[in-house]
A protein has these predicted regions:
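Bacterial N-terminal signal peptides that target proteins for export
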Residues: 1-8
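Ser/Thr/Gly-rich flexible loops in soluble cytosolic domains mediating phosphotransfer, phosphorylation
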Residues: 115-117
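Sec/Tat signal peptide C-region and signal peptidase I cleavage site
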Residues: 15-22
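N-terminal secretory/targeting leader peptides
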Residues: 23-112, 121-123, 128-329
Length: 329
């Protein structure tokens, strides 16, 4: 009898140990601090996913594991299950993803919502292209519109850009400042504070929420509201890891993604408003463009769209079709 009891107890312990070791983890790398709105949004995703499944979500923020530029390779290779990267990080192999960074193309929240909605004509092209890298888009994280940061002089005219070295975070954004006579410097988000502090660049661009989360008002004193591009981040997951999950687990990820995507998109206007207030409260001058200044910047940078179309297949190519789809939104 004692032997039977021992066997039963051993079996229970083995089953318990197996369950522990079989625990499914989803590690997510993020370049921003957890307190930033993208980090807070990942907490929404974590809560919703863990509520619906046995997947345990672990978030590694502040580029602890990978910098933004390293995320596509890390996730695509399976070095980590998932990660958040700015959309432009996939432009090396898929230049069409830079559609959102074309100057002044998405000039209203309505257009941005339509373009980034799951299943939109634009995402029907972008998501499969990104997935070829082995990193599958789960959902887009709104980061807001791109603004310009500088010291002393606002960046409100083409002349203000001339001969300045400017921090950018993508090739197409680099083409934008080049078209205005500036010199682009590709610097990751986690390194921009030091670049401004050390004077490595004369000016820079970012999403206004980054001014708050990274305390950029400590090193730059002027914010020009150009809204020249729509900054999108994307949570991607490794394709092989996704395929290894059960149908129930994948369904839970899809449901959690939908909730988190809607949450960050709906709160974007409030996030930006709070960021502008904090920037102003900390001494930053907020400069808004006049209609004449906006027109001048738009006209001076129009060649960027033509160059994008040429780089993505020319007339009738994928980029041309995306630009036309964007103009119809």
């Amino acid at each position: 009898m004692k032997t039977i009891k021992q066997l039963v107890l051993t079996s229970i312990l083995v089953l318990f140990a197996s369950a522990v070791f079989a625990e499914t983890k989803m590690r997510i790398t993020l370049q921003l601090p957890l307190k930033a709105h993208l980090g807070q949004n990942l907490l929404v995703f974590k809560k919703e996913l863990e509520k619906r499944s046995d997947i345990i979500v672990e978030i590694y923020d502040s580029a602890q594991l990978y910098k933004d530029k390293e995320v596509p390779q890390a996730v695509g290779s399976g070095a980590i299950e998932a990660g958040v990267a700015s959309l432009t990080r996939f432009a090396g192999t898929n230049p069409e993803v830079d559609i959102f960074y074309l100057p002044f193309l998405f000039d209203s929240e309505k257009k941005i919502r339509k373009a980034t909605k799951s299943g939109s004509k634009i995402r029907q092209v972008l998501d499969p292209a990104i997935s070829k890298s082995g990193a599958v888009p789960l959902y887009y994280q709104a980061y807001g519109s791109a603004v310009m940061l500088s010291n002393g002089t606002p960046m409100n005219t083409p002349a203000a850009f001339k001969n300045k070295k400017i921090r950018v975070f993508g090739k197409t954004l680099g083409a934008f400042v080049s078209s205005l006579g500036a010199k682009p410097a590709l610097i990751s988000g986690s390194e921009q504070y030091l670049a401004y502090q050390r004077g490595t660049v004369d000016a820079g661009m970012t999403g206004v929420s980054g001014v708050k989360s990274r305390k950029l008002y400590q090193v730059m004193d002027t914010l020009t509201v150009t809204n020249h591009g729509d900054i999108e981040f994307v949570l991607v997951a490794n394709q092989k890891w996704l395929n290894s999950l059960t149908k129930k687990q994948r369904k839970a990820i899809t449901e959690a993604s939908k909730i988190a995507e809607k949450a960050v998109r709906d709160d974007m206007s409030g996030i930006e408003a709070r960021a502008y207030k904090e920037a102003e409260d900390n001494g930053m001058k907020i400069i808004k463009l006049s209609s004449a200044e906006l027109k001048a910047l738009k006209n001076a940078s129009s060649s960027v769209i033509a160059d994008y179309i040429e780089r993505t297949g020319g007339k009738g190519g994928v980029g041309d079709k995306l630009v036309k789809a964007a103009n119809k939104l």
